[in-house]
């Protein structure tokens, strides 16, 4: 009987390999089982190490990018970078990678990009940043143009953050790299490579470790940032600049280590299973923008999924923009340099995030869905957004009204902007956590109950299209509102933003209610969700 089971298992495996045009392999039951187990464990460990290295670089680049932007530019400059520069740079990067994949495998392409990034970090730390005063226009060039309200009288004051983006191009370049690292290097290249190379069993073992790895990375990065920030504050200017360059040496070394880890991961997987040597090409039917809109018109469920993703992205982007707008004022009140103050806030945010991720690793939201149902998990993020709207925005509005008095009054009012900053940091961090740990998990649970016929195309629309539309709406709104009201910061029109965000919170909740209705129906019928493609 056992021999028959082994033969049946081998036949099934061989048929699968024939279907995928791969060479079949027959293993003995004992040796094959041991090899499979050790191979899966090795793959999970290697990919976990690679993910940890890439995530640590991402966490540190986030801190460095914020630090240099606060030191040389202003929060509204970040909005311009996100709304105007990030998207074309993303498309350019993707096109380069796609062309490179014609000649290189996914692992080799990732390693080439990591080596190029390592060289960039060295150049930035030793050439671009130390000599940026000689390479860039004079520090006071754009500041003189907009000083003393000269452009305010011409209703052109909103151009000031844009001028800073191009005159302070060194900090803009670093912020762009920091912004693109997480979305392109990790999300686009690493995860597509992991899914491409790993078996289904290896992916199932690897995915639960992501939360734990991210928690450890954020905790260690937050503690290190806090420690370096304290040391940096006690140093003279030239020593601070030297320490900054040394940080880029470490970042470059970590990037090289990531490339080496990637290389050995590929070699180890190929050695354990020769099937990984060949590249599999899967043709996926692509749906354009017009096709996505037509499908959303037909399916109310898909429209609700996309609306919820767009609303979540818009709310989180605007909350963060308004929070960042008050950091400069908080630094002035606390008599701290802007970069040091920003580092302190980022370090605390990373530590808070790590604590929540550790809790969620041991008490995942998937268990809450099984116990409490889908709706309580999905509604957590919009409730946190509404709480932030009610608590944080009035605080910003009051501080805007009394801004001149608060800055001039000295010790009597010290703490109002600082309190706003720490409240904003905590609430935006909680929004981010609730979005990733609750809303995204609930969205994935609903997506899994969609028929496999539509699942891939639906996910491409509500995740791929929805997230990009949400980010674009948030960034473009923040940029346009400064133009319309002729202000330098979106924080100055928080009353308008309250209404705008409130509308998207309502859209978010309404979409969740519809998804919950369809999810419940599918559970009761013990069938896939009715996506209503035949309707409308």
UniProtKB/Swiss-Prot annotation:
It is found in: Cell membrane. The keyword ATP-binding applies. Glycans are attached at residues 400, 421. GO terms for cellular component: plasma membrane. Signal peptide: none annotated. The chain crosses the membrane at residues 44-64, 77-97, 109-129, 172-194, 205-225, 244-264, 309-329, 349-369, 378-398, 465-485, 493-513. Its main location: membrane. The keyword Isomerase does not apply. InterPro entries: ADP_ATP_car_bac_type (IPR004667). GO terms for molecular function: ATP binding; ATP:ADP antiporter activity. Keywords: ATP-binding, Cell membrane, Glycoprotein, Membrane, Nucleotide-binding, Transmembrane, Transmembrane helix, Transport. It is a multi-pass membrane protein. Belongs to the ADP/ATP translocase tlc family. PANTHER family: ADP,ATP CARRIER PROTEIN 1, PTHR31187. ATP transporter involved in the uptake of ATP from the host cell cytoplasm. Provides the microsporidian cell with host ATP in exchange for ADP. This is an obligate exchange system. This energy acquiring activity is an important component of microsporidian parasitism. This is ADP,ATP carrier protein 4. It comes from Encephalitozoon cuniculi (strain GB-M1) (Microsporidian parasite).
């Amino acid at each position: 009987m056992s021999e028959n089971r082994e033969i049946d298992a081998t036949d099934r495996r061989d048929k699968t390999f024939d279907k995928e045009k791969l060479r079949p392999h027959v293993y003995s039951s004992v040796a094959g089982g041991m090899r499979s187990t050790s191979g899966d464990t090795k793959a999970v460990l290697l990919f976990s190490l690679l993910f940890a290295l890439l995530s640590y670089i991402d966490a540190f680049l986030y801190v460095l990018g914020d630090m240099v932007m606060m030191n040389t530019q202003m929060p509204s400059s970040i909005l311009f970078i996100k709304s105007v520069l990030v998207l074309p740079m993303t498309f350019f990067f993707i096109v380069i990678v796609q062309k490179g994949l014609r000649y290189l495998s996914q692992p080799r392409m990732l390693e080439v990009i990591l080596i190029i990034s390592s060289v960039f970090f060295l150049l930035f730390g030793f050439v671009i940043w130390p000599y940026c005063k000689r390479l860039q226009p004079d520090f006071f060039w754009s500041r003189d143009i907009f000083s003393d309200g000269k452009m305010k009288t011409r209703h052109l004051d909103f151009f000031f953050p844009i001028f800073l983006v191009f005159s302070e191009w060194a900090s803009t370049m670093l912020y762009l790299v920091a912004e693109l690292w997480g979305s392109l290097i990790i999300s686009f290249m690493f995860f597509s490579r992991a899914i491409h190379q790993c078996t289904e069993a290896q992916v199932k073992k690897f995915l639960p470790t992501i939360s734990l790895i991210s928690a450890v990375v954020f905790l260690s990065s937050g503690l290190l940032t806090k420690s370096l920030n304290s040391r940096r504050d006690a140093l003279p200017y030239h020593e601070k600049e030297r320490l900054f360059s040394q940080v880029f040496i470490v970042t470059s070394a970590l990037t090289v280590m990531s490339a080496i880890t990637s290389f050995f991961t590929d070699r180890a997987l190929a050695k354990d299973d020769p099937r990984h040597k060949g590249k599999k090409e899967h043709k996926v039917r692509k749906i354009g923008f017009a096709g996505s809109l037509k499908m959303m018109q037909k399916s109310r469920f898909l429209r609700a999924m996309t609306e919820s993703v767009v609303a979540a992205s818009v709310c989180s982007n605007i909350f963060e923009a308004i929070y960042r707008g008050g950091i400069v004022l908080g630094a002035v009140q606390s008599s701290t340099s802007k970069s040091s103050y920003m580092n302190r806030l980022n370090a605390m945010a990373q530590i808070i995030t790590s604590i929540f991720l550790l809790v969620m690793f041991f008490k995942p939201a998937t268990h809450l869905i099984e116990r409490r149902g889908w709706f309580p998990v999905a509604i957590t993020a919009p409730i946190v957004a509404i709480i932030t709207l009610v608590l944080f925005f009035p605080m910003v509005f009051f501080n805007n009204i009394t801004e001149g008095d608060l800055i001039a009054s000295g010790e009597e009012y010290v703490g109002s902007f600082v309190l706003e900053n720490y409240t904003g940091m905590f609430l935006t961090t909680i929004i981010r956590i609730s979005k990733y740990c609750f809303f995204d998990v609930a969205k994935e649970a609903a997506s899994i109950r969609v028929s496999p016929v539509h699942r891939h195309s639906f996910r491409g629309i509500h995740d791929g299209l929805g997230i990009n539309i949400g980010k674009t709406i948030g960034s473009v709104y923040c940029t346009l509102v400064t133009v319309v009201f002729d202000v330098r910061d979106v924080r100055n029109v928080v009353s308008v933003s309250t209404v705008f965000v409130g509308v998207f919170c309502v859209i978010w909740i309404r979409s969740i209610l519809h998804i919950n209705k369809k999810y419940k129906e599918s559970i009761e019928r013990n069938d896939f969700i009715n996506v209503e493609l035949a309707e409308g």
